[in-house]
């Protein structure tokens, strides 16, 4: 009996995911039982506030739907355990998950340990388990405060928007500020008045007999009579050209100086997301899903499961001394000693960084991308290759450049020519950094040298409005303004799109009408919540809680009272969009009453003013989008051209009440004349694959595709054959690999 008890008493380790569990189990061996919680197991209730404001913001937590079985299995697993190790992620969210596990499972403090590590490698895991600690309640309190703040804003503001704007809308403490940034940029672009200006480019070359004779280069007109000058119109530009054609072009000054171009630091979360978006078109969510898999571990054949990168939610740029030594050895061996700096490069972090965090880097730089490519999906390889190259380049010698500047005088006009050339490639061998296509290398010039004028080209230009935010530039702006943290950038970008407040078109953000209306009303009635600086200060306050500089209740009290007053005032003073409904020059086709413009969560639509007697509605659509005089065969409303994830199609203007739609291509295809032979191009092709927007539950970064097999339809991963996930039915969002 004692032997049986001894056998059943093991140490239990709890992590978030099955993939992470498998990698850690391989390292720890049979002495440990490693279990997965499948992420969060408890949260505030869905259908109530879940916060007792009058009792010091006491939260009420409920086990999440579908997680009862997980909790029951974990309770059974820890019942006879000698020790329980909570090995969730090392950030605030991971600490909160560990605390919730301890509470939900009723774990005794003397048997419960917290282990944290930055990478899932044998060295790191062994070190973490050799010195376990206790749950950091400062981190837990900071995460609790964030969750309650977000719940207060979302749960209390959303009903106001339903009442004043449209049902189904929602507001968020951080997301609403991000939407504001897009809306304000939209207004700047709309209000921008372009101004015409002209550039004059001279093509010049040293004269015969001079060094580099005949080597052409370009110079731009920059000054007239010592003052900055750009012609305002074509007439002024042509007048300048006529004057310049008579002038002698002389070198006033020529300078050459050597400069260096250092590689940027290894990746933080935000820079990884920005670079992956710009380079591969990955959404922040997709980037983080792929990075999660690389961190938790992948099978490398005979080498087994290996964690390939360090923890991917970080704003730190520091690197461990062991990793620095390893990368310096690789640079010396692979590229030569001339590419290795005398001392390692150390980078200064922005803001407040946790000491335990590192930059995102490979767990072993010796594991070169091409060597493990066969074991990775295409997207996993892209991201790993990006991380590996960024880390290696950051510790290589800089690119050495020769910068050239020539100032050229032509009568009362001054031209400027700039050039650069690479003297030593440095990190560019890895980073791929290079000169821009339009950069030139100037010939050898000297002061007072007379040049040959080979041509003058005036070109028309217009001042440009501020650029629209891309995914990368919006994340960069959020980070620079102190809004959000590494774990929140991806959810922010996803949420503002899912709510319909912004849309992403050709990788650029556009504010929707609903987003603009909601933003304007929130700015007017909740200036603090919508203020960028206020939101940044709240983030700093949460950092203070984590660092034990303030109590989490102080943060909540400071926020809640002004928010409550603003909410009460808005209930009375905010004008309902329903009261702003305006008649349009159109009569209801059903009853002849005037139509009015109204607002829903999807945007404006037309409705009959005789509602509720007449319930006719129609999508408010631009005239050019109407599909001629075609009517819906189901309800007689107009058919309009709409855009979906797979292109344009015809849909009913009365959507969502009428869901009729048809292929636009089918209507555009020419009819085959009667009796004409059937051509190959006219044959109907069998549809064998149908993409979806559902992420692969295996976490490989792919999307699910509906395919047809010998036994009927099934769902498979777009990364096949690297990912072999399949399912008979479409999984629900958030389903894990182990659920399938």
Where are these regions (language model features)?
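Conserved short loop/turn motifs at secondary-structure junctions
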Residues: 9, 89-90, 166-170, 256-265, ...
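C-terminal helical "lid" subdomain and adjoining coupling/linker elements of P-loop NTPases
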Residues: 164-168, 183-232, 279
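Metal- or metallocofactor-binding catalytic centers and their adjacent structured scaffolds
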Residues: 230-265, 449
């Amino acid at each position: 009996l004692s032997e049986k008890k001894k056998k059943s008493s093991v140490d239990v380790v709890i992590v978030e995911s099955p993939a992470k569990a498998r990698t850690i189990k391989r390292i720890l061996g049979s002495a440990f039982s490693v279990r997965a919680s499948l992420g969060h197991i408890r949260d505030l209730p869905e259908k109530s506030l879940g916060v007792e404001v009058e009792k010091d913001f006491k939260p009420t937590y409920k086990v999440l739907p579908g997680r009862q079985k997980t909790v029951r299995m974990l309770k059974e697993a820890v019942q006879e355990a000698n020790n329980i190790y909570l090995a969730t992620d090392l950030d605030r969210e991971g600490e909160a998950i560990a605390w919730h596990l301890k509470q939900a499972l009723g774990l005794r403090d003397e048997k419960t340990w917290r282990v944290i590590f930055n990478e899932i490698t044998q060295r790191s895991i062994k070190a973490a388990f050799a010195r376990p600690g206790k749950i950091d309640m400062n981190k837990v309190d900071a995460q609790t405060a964030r969750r309650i703040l977000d719940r207060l804003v979302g749960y209390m503001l959303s009903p106001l928007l339903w009442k004043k704007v449209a049902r189904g809308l929602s507001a968020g403490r951080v997301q609403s500020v991000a939407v504001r940034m897009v809306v304000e940029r939209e207004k700047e672009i709309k209000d921008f008045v372009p101004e015409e200006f002209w550039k004059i480019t001279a093509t010049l070359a040293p004269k015969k007999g001079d060094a580099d004779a005949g080597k052409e280069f370009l110079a731009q007109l920059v000054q007239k009579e010592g003052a900055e000058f750009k012609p305002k119109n074509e007439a002024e530009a042509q007048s300048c050209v006529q004057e310049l054609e008579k002038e002698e072009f002389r070198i006033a000054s020529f300078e050459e100086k050597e400069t260096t171009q250092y590689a940027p630091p290894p990746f933080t979360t935000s820079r990884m997301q920005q670079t992956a978006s710009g380079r591969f078109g990955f959404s922040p969510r997709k980037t983080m899903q792929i990075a999660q898999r690389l961190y938790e571990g992948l099978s490398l054949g005979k080498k087994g499961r290996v964690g390939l990168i360090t923890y991917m939610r970080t704003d730190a740029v520091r690197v461990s001394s062991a990793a620095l030594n390893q990368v310096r050895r690789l640079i010396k061996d692979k590229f030569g000693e001339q590419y290795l700096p005398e001392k390692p490069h150390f980078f200064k972090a922005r803001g407040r960084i946790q000491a335990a965090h590192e930059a995102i880097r490979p767990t072993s730089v010796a594991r070169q991308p091409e060597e493990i490519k066969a074991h990775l999906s295409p997207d996993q390889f892209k991201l790993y290759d990006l991380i590996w190259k960024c880390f290696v380049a950051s510790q290589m010698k800089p690119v050495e450049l020769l910068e050239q500047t020539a100032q050229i005088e032509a009568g009362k006009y001054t031209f400027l020519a700039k050039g650069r050339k690479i003297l030593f490639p440095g990190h560019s061998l890895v980073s791929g950094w290079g000169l821009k296509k339009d950069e030139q290398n100037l010939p050898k010039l000297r002061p007072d040298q007379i040049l040959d004028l080979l041509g003058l080209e005036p070109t028309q230009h217009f001042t440009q409005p501020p650029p629209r935010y891309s995914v990368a530039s919006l994340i960069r702006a959020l980070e620079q303004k102190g809004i959000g943290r590494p774990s929140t950038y991806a959810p922010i970008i996803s949420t503002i799109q899912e709510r319909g407040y912004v849309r992403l078109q050709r990788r650029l953000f556009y504010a929707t009408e609903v987003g603009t209306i909601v933003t304007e009303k929130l700015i007017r009635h909740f200036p603090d919540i919508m203020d960028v600086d206020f939101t940044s200060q709240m983030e700093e306050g949460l950092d203070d809680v984590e660092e034990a500089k303030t109590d989490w209740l102080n943060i909540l009290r400071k926020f809640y009272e002004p928010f409550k007053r603003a909410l009460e005032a808005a209930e009375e003073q905010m004008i309902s969009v329903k009261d702003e409904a305006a008649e349009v020059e159109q009569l209801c086709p059903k009853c002849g009453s005037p139509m009015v413009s109204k607002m829903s969560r999807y945007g404006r639509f037309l409705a009959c003013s005789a509602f509720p007697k007449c319930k006719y509605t129609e999508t408010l659509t631009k005239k050019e989008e109407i599909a001629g005089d075609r009517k819906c065969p189901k309800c007689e409303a107009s058919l309009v051209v709409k855009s979906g994830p797979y292109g344009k199609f015809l849909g009913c203007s009365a959507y969502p009440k009428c869901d009729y739609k048809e292929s636009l291509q089918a209507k555009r295809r020419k009819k085959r004349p009667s009796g004409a032979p059937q051509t190959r191009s006219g044959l109907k092709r069998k549809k064998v694959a149908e993409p979806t927007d559902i992420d692969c539950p295996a976490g490989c970064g792919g999307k699910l595709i509906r395919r047809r097999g010998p036994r009927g339809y099934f769902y498979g991963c777009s990364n096949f054959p690297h990912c072999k996930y399949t399912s008979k039915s479409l999984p629900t969002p958030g389903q894990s690999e182990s659920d399938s």
